[in-house]
Amino acid sequence: MIKPLEKERRPISSTFESETRQPFDLSDDLKARVDALGLAETVQHAKEEGYGYIYDAAPMEFIEHLKEAIYRNAEGFEGPRGSNMLLTKDPIFAEAVLNPKLLTIVEILCGKGAMLSQLSSTIIPKRTDSPRKGGLHADQNWTPAPFPVHNQTITLCWACVDYTPEGGSTRVIPNSHLLRRHPTSEEVAEEAGVISTECPAGTIVFWNGSIWHGGGTRTIEGERVVLHTTFSRMAMRPIENYDFLGEEWLADKPYEMRVLLGREDFLNKDGTRANLDKVTQTMNWAKT
């Protein structure tokens, strides 16, 4: 089992922060966590290129169990398939969301209080017709350009099989996040500068909300099996709604799960007055 960052409830802040941290200006606590988890090179790559890899994210036994759960919950039995709203469909999905390395990258790219936006899977078989082209986009599709300086979303994909060009890995255009806009139709068609991500099974490949990327074409036998985890800043509406999960379901979950589901901020609740204890914390998280 992958241990969460910590299970104790953190104290609510009572002091408003006046300054907003700029992207990749990490607090001492966050720097220490990055170093302890061996993520320094990963963070630097993400800062420069807009995407990155979390290697050895979990033991291969975990990856195999994750892969089995993806197949077991997929809709359909052949061809491209997958599933959405996976959080409650197998305990291993919640464990994947709470991975300490993953959550550290999420905090760096989307700040404290980031919410789980979507948890889905895809199973992509070998393509027998022409190679896939087009489909380049930025995941901040519902954010107008120019994109904010602070990243709004992050997608992290658990690669349950090797990620290779011939295996249909996600394709990205490095540094495209610096443009802070959506690609034009001409840029989507041309795909100038596109590369395929490459990493072994057991890696989490991720990109920020501004990077231009798209799916690849699998030209070899077998299937590409991936768990997609998307997070957003707490001010954004998530894609999937887990409001139906009550305190009974959350009772044995760590504090981090409450944060990811928006239970520790005052937004989308029954008014500010009823949640005064969380107002300051929410405002401070928004500045990270």
Please describe what each predicted stretch is.
Residues 2-147:
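Non-heme Fe(II)-dependent double-stranded beta-helix
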Residues 119-121, 156-158, 227-231:
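A structural signal for short, well-ordered beta-strand segments
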Residues 59-61, 123-124, 141, 163-165, ...:
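Short, solvent-exposed loop/turn segments at secondary-structure junctions
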Residues 131-198, 236-245:
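Catalytic core of non-heme Fe(II) oxygenases with the double-stranded beta-helix
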Residues 2, 179-211, 216-288:
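Conserved double-stranded beta-helix
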Residues 115, 150-152, 221-223:
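A short, structural micro-pattern
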Residues 53-54, 156, 205-207:
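Short hydrophobic-aromatic micro-motifs
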